[in-house]
């Protein structure tokens, strides 16, 4: 996977960027608040995923502008492709020049981002880990996004119905309609549980290996487990359950939880309550891990995701390292800076020193939303 050209127009503070990155490592350096993270964000949005930053799409527009655009030329599986996004009164997307739903970019443009906020993956609640898991699955199985959209709609309808039933005082008359929603929910819930269990089964071994490689502590094994709010039938793993058995089991669980649903005016069981537990030496990394251990766990998960993507798709994703280089040990810094990762890498940092230790690749300076190319690569503008 290689980004061969990137253009932005009126995206956040970025001026008209038009850059041809190096095929290996690309270092973007500059002082804080110059636009480095904005550039990384622009690249990541081309995956069709939500931004890794807490932001509204209206924030993407440069002050005083009505439309922001991101355009890319890239190669994937030896095929040249293009992708584009536009943000204005509505969000638009194009793939190979043809307008499409933004979600259709998922699985076409492959990238994994590391940012200072990645600690939330370990430190925060289950929703952070579900989001990571669902985003990772979507990049290797794009149709999974349709399933996620479906369960969101079904849960909204089911929760609305439960509220109406409680307020009407005539819940019994409405139970047949609730059972209809239960059948719909069971179908998509099984698909999600099955996909999550299968992905975690593939993710866990490389994550444990990478964590061990980072920490060098054989007495602190890393373990990853799926903790669904509805356990699989008969103690099985959801990855091994058939659709018929799984859907019937989920319908029964929903029926058993109905009184609890009525009490809480919402659906209390389902994939929206799942967790992915990370433990070190059998102890919760979230509750008892040091910040260093938590950072290593997050890095191990992300690098394992890259490995699973490469094994599944035959293509190494682009790695985006946003202001995290200083948090990595020398071995990991060298891994990225010296081109040991099989794919393309973009690294942002404040210190120009990273550019000096760069192996084969390119260094760029970001200043006030302008990207300055090295003299030997510049066409119109040299670094001041």
Please give the residue ranges for each predicted region:
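Nucleotide-state sensing region of NTPase/ATPase domains
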Residues: 47-128, 132-144, 205-209, 253-259
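Walker B catalytic acidic pair
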Residues: 322-324
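Conserved lysine of the Walker
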Residues: 35-36
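Structural recognition of the conserved hydrophobic beta-strand(s) that form the central parallel beta-sheet
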Residues: 72, 344-351
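Conserved NTPase motor "head" modules and their coupling/switch loops across ABC/AAA+ ATPases, GTPases
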Residues: 1-31, 172-318, 327-331, 335-338, ...
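A conserved P-loop NTPase coupling/switch region
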Residues: 104-108, 115-187, 374-377
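Helix-to-loop junction immediately C-terminal to a conserved catalytic motif
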Residues: 44
């Amino acid at each position: 996977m290689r980004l061969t050209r990137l253009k932005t127009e009126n995206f956040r503070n970025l001026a008209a960027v038009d850059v041809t990155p190096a095929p290996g490592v690309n270092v973007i350096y500059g002082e804080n608040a110059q636009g480095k993270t904005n550039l990384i964000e622009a690249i990541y949005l081309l995956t069709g995923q939500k931004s890794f930053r807490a932001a509204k799409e209206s924030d993407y527009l440069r002050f005083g502008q009505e439309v922001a655009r991101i355009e890319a030329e890239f190669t994937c599986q030896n095929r040249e492709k293009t992708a584009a996004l536009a943000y204005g009164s509505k969000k638009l997307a194009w793939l190979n020049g043809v307008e499409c739903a933004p979600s259709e970019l998922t699985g076409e443009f492959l990238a994994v981002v590391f940012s200072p906020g990645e600690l939330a993956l370990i430190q925060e609640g289950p929703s952070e880990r579900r989001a990571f898991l669902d985003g990772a699955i979507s990049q290797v199985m794009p149709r999974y996004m349709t399933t996620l959209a479906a369960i969101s709609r079904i849960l909204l309808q089911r929760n609305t119905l439960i509220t109406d039933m409680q307020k009407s005082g005539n819940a019994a008359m409405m139970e047949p309609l609730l059972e209809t929603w239960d059948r719909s929910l069971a179908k998509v819930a099984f698909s999600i549980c099955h996909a999550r269990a299968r992905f975690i089964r593939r993710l866990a071994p490389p994550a444990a290996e990478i964590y061990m490689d980072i920490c060098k502590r054989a007495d602190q094994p890393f373990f990853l487990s799926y903790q669904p709010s509805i356990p699989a039938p008969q103690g099985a793993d959801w990855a091994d359950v058939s659709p018929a058995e799984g859907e019937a089991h989920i319908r029964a669980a929903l029926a058993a939880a109905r009184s609890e649903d009525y009490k809480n005016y919402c659906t209390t069981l389902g994939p929206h309550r799942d967790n992915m537990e990370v433990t070190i030496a059998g102890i919760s990394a979230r509750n008892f891990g040091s910040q260093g251990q938590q950072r290593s766990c997050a890095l191990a998960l992300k690098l394992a995701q890259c490995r699973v993507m490469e094994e599944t798709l035959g293509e190494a994703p682009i790695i985006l390292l946003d202001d995290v280089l200083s948090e990595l040990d020398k071995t990991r810094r060298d891994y990225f800076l010296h081109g040991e990762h099989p794919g393309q890498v973009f690294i942002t940092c404040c210190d120009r020193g990273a550019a000096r230790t760069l192996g084969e690749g390119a260094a760029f300076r970001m200043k006030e939303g302008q990207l300055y190319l090295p003299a030997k690569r510049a066409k119109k503008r040299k670094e001041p």
